[in-house]
């Protein structure tokens, strides 16, 4: 089995999708699948080693994509599948490459591709064509599968949850010491740290949660940690609510965030819509209770056994979840965290993720 893997998200590009792509590719390679990654990018990247080809899109992506086919065509018969992973240009080009090469197309649909792509005048036709041209579609949230099936009824859709390697995702003693020192300097005694981590854009519900903390009268119980890129206007909102103690940290590499996680008593993901964010798995794997909506794949991971869940977009339910979290004692939080870590180990490991993709690939050869 040999895959032509077309993506816009691959290291050294930053972000959760690049991390996910790298993890899935590595898992398949470890299972004996040959994967040739085609990284479509507008960034100036140095040439990579064997198995990764960078295709600079530049100012003329149409030319770059067509030119790539010229170099691909003579050896296209060595592949068994074409895979489209995340982003508009992979969803645009991979169906064409698959059709011209006479190969099955597997589309690995990520949250952003579908959730907002379906309501974009520019992207909707691209996404729909890719779904309908696919021999199989994989989604990271169980609730997304029927939505895809309604739009592409003849295409098989499979839920394959994101995974995490818990053996390598651990906080070092030195990181815990730094986190404790940071808390001693920045967090008032008696306050719990509530972290929101990643690209904190509109869909992540950041303001929904902050408003729930303030409106519920719990601003004095929490210190908010905002680690990542903030949505526009959030700085002004925070300035207008001086009762809310917070620290804003810049976007950081995944492993740099281990120190941030170590400083958090809870991690919040109050998304309006989502896939299955890596942050949720990372926090749960470290034994940190999660305060989250039931958007997308968060519903597959989070329940009251491991955290505080509420219906996505419901401000009253969000306020109630914040209230429950504020009143939980240390023993309750520790029990929730331990249950979350156990759930991730049992249900969301990399081996399960890889097996899911291997099953789909084998069924479409």
Predicted regions and their residues:
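Short alpha-helical donor nucleotide-sugar binding micro-motif in glycosyltransferases
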Residues: 259-264
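Nucleotide-activated donor-binding/catalytic signature segment of Leloir-type glycosyltransferases, i.e.
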Residues: 235-252
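Aromatic "clamp/platform" in nucleotide-sugar-dependent glycosyltransferases that forms part
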Residues: 272
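Short hydrophobic beta-strand element within catalytic cores of glycosyltransferases
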Residues: 289-292
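Short His-centered aromatic/hydrophobic patch
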Residues: 84-90
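Donor nucleotide-sugar binding/catalytic pocket of nucleotide-sugar-dependent glycosyltransferases
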Residues: 107, 127-178, 188
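Conserved acidic donor-binding segment of nucleotide-sugar-dependent glycosyltransferases
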Residues: 304, 308-316, 325-330
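Conserved donor-binding/catalytic core segment of Leloir-type glycosyltransferases
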Residues: 4-6, 188-204, 210-213
């Amino acid at each position: 089995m040999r895959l032509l893997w077309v993506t816009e998200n691959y290291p050294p590009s930053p972000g959760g999708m690049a991390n996910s792509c790298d993890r899935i590719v590595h898992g398949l390679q470890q299972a004996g699948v040959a994967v040739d990654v085609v990284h479509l990018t507008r960034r100036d990247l140095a040439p990579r080693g064997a198995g990764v080809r960078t295709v600079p899109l530049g100012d003329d992506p149409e030319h770059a994509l067509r030119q790539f086919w010229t170099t691909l065509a003579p050896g296209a018969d060595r592949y068994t599948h074409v895979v489209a992973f995340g982003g508009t240009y992979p969803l645009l080009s991979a169906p064409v490459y698959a059709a011209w090469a006479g190969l099955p197309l597997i589309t690995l649909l990520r949250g952003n591709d579908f959730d907002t792509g379906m309501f974009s005048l520019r992207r909707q036709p691209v996404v729909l064509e890719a779904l309908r041209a696919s021999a199989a579609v994989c989604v990271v949230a169980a609730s997304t599968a029927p939505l895809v099936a309604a739009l592409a009824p003849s295409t098989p859709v499979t839920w394959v949850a994101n995974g995490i390697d818990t053996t390598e995702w651990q906080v070092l003693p030195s990181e815990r010491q730094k986190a404790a020192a940071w808390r001693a300097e920045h967090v008032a005694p008696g306050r719990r740290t509530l972290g929101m981590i990643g690209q904190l854009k509109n869909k992540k519900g950041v303001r929904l949660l902050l408003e729930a903390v303030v409106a519920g009268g719990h601003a004095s119980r929490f210190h908010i940690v905002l680690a990542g890129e903030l949505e526009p206007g959030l700085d002004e909102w925070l300035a207008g609510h001086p009762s809310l103690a917070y620290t804003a940290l810049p976007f950081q590499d995944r492993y740099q965030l281990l120190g941030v996680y170590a400083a958090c008593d809870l991690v919040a993901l109050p998304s309006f819509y989502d896939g299955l964010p890596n942050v949720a798995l990372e926090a749960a794997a470290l034994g940190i209770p999660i305060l989250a909506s039931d958007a997308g794949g968060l519903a597959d991971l989070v329940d009251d056994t491991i955290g505080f869940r509420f219906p996505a977009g419901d401000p009253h339910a969000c306020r109630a979840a914040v209230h429950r979290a504020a009143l939980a004692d240390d023993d309750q939080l520790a029990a929730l965290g331990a249950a979350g870590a156990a759930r991730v180990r049992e249900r969301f490991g990399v081996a399960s993720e890889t097996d899911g993709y291997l099953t789909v690939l084998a069924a479409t050869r």
